[in-house]
Amino acid sequence: MAYRVQWLTPLAAVLSSILTISASPPAAARDIVAFRDGSYSAGTIVIRTNERRLYYVMGDGRAVRYPVGVGKAGKAWNGRVQIEGKYIRPAWSPPADVKRDKPQLPNLIAGGSPRNPMGAAAMTLSGGGQYAIHGTNVPGTVGGFVSYGCFRMYNQDVLDLYSRVSVGTAVVVTR
């Protein structure tokens, strides 16, 4: 039995390191890129859902580009909205359509809980309060067509964006 424990302990360490590496986002989760579309002023957030990218326009022909998870088939949308609220480790109540699809979810998941899909921070969007730009508890979904209309970011990326924007920041969602 002692032999088995000695063997399992190193195995557990190896598996733990593999799982930690695979659960971590890529090192270049965000980058600064050329952004020459003069339609948007500095400080604007532009989300291009077909690219699954969010751009924070810096001006001077550059933007910070972040990967995002976007609305799945039938849930994608486009339009102009604003950041309506900013929250660190927010609690989450599943909207009616999520609750319908996943009735086992509790009515409220506390902020900071590993089960909370909002992740490290959320910025709610105007237009009814049903959509947000937020972190995630499942980093592997960033970059996919996966949400009910919200925009999922790696937690370190949503915190970076959070620090750059304020309530009232313009958000333009395009396909």
What annotation goes with each model-predicted range?
Residues 1-12:
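Bacterial N-terminal signal peptides that target proteins for export
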Residues 17-26:
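C-terminal segment of classical bacterial N-terminal signal peptides
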Residues 50-52, 129:
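Beta-strand-connecting loop/turn residues
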Residues 31, 37-40, 60, 65, ...:
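Exported/periplasmic cell-wall-interacting domains
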